[in-house]
UniProtKB/Swiss-Prot annotation:
Residues 121-124 are annotated as: G4. The Era-type G (guanine nucleotide-binding) domain has GTPase activity, while the C-terminal KH type-2 domain is required for 16S rRNA binding and for membrane localization. Neither rRNA binding nor membrane localization require the N-terminal G domain, and the GTPase does not require the KH domain. Residues 38-42 are annotated as: G2. Residues 150-152 are annotated as: G5. This is GTPase Era. Residues 4-171 form the Era-type G domain. Its main location: cytoplasm.
Length: 299
């Protein structure tokens, strides 16, 4: 039996459901999710392997008009995948009309000369007539290889989309071991899980200004727990106060919720310590961006 493999990028505007789709395919949380725009900041691989195929999905930051050096990094990181993949999934939401952001992405996709599958997500939110209208609108903009409507949240048609990708794979190598599900180290996943809880629990002004750095991560032989020390970075003193909360209540809640997810991922008991530090305007300083894991070598 021949083995097939390939790389697939997931592109689209912020908040269209790219990470939800990837997590559903993988059957576990690989990419963090929230209703805040620009939740995903780095390219994240989800490695889907069966006995006959390996599909390496690359979840990308939502493409937007950048206003900071961090925004520039995120957009370039997303577009750089067009040089690396065999197929692109261009994801759009069924419940929003095509906009300038979609048109900007379509122009880049046309220039890339890579097969593109249009994935219309969130079909659970619209009437079938609206869905058909949305599909027709996008079909007139570009010659898509396939158009697949799905609900990543409910799982509708997701397996069909994976089957379509599989059918179009070329014979190839197994690039990663069968038990490897992502390219990122555990430290990265831990930092993302802490950041996810900050996004869920804090006000609108906070999310874009937060980075999380895992300072240390090691097993304590006496307690048989993984001890993790993580620092939450913000840009202003007022943001630090919000994250700490009255009497430290918010920081404690962030840590408690993150610890549960980290324990599920690691399969170990975890002791998580968190601090909050202010690093003014870090999103516009390349050295700070590199220190916090946003490296230009990603693209």
């Amino acid at each position: 039996m021949t083995f097939k493999s390939g790389f697939v990028a997931i592109l689209g505007r912020p908040n269209v459901g790219k990470s939800t789709f990837l997590n559903h395919v993988m059957g576990q949380k690989i990419a963090i999710m929230s209703d805040k725009a620009q939740t995903t900041r780095n390219k994240i691989m989800g490695i889907y392997t069966t006995d006959k195929e390996q599909i390496v999905f690359i979840d990308t930051p939502g493409i937007h008009k950048p206003k900071t050096a961090l925004g520039d990094f995120m957009v370039e990181s997303a577009y750089s995948t067009l040089r690396e993949v065999d197929t692109v999934l261009f994801m759009v939401p069924a419940d929003e009309a095509r906009g300038k952001g979609d048109d900007m992405i379509i122009e880049r996709l046309k220039a890339a000369k890579v097969p593109v599958i249009l994935v219309v997500n969130k079909i659970d939110k619209v009437h079938p007539d609206q869905l058909l209208s949305q599909i027709d609108d996008f079909r007139n903009q570009m010659d898509f290889k396939e158009i697949v409507p799905i609900s990543a949240l409910q799982g509708n048609n997701v397996s069909r989309l994976v089957d379509i990708l599989s059918e179009n794979l070329d014979e190839g190598f197994q690039y990663f071991p069968s038990d490897q599900i992502t390219d990122h180290p555990e430290r990265f996943l831990v930092s993302e899980m802490v950041r996810e809880k900050v996004l869920h629990l804090t006000r609108e002004e906070i999310p874009h200004s937060v980075a999380v750095v895992v300072d240390s991560m090691k097993r304590d032989e006496e307690t048989d727990k993984v001890h993790i020390r993580a620092t939450i970075m913000v840009e202003r003193d007022s943001q630090k106060g919000i994250i700490i909360g009255k009497g430290g209540a918010m920081l404690k809640k962030i840590g408690s919720m993150a610890r549960r997810d980290i324990e599920l991922m690691l399969g170990d008991k975890v002791f998580l310590e968190t601090w909050v530090k202010v690093k003014k305007n870090w999103r516009d300083k390349k050295l700070d961006l590199a220190d916090f894991g946003y490296n230009e070598r990603e693209y």
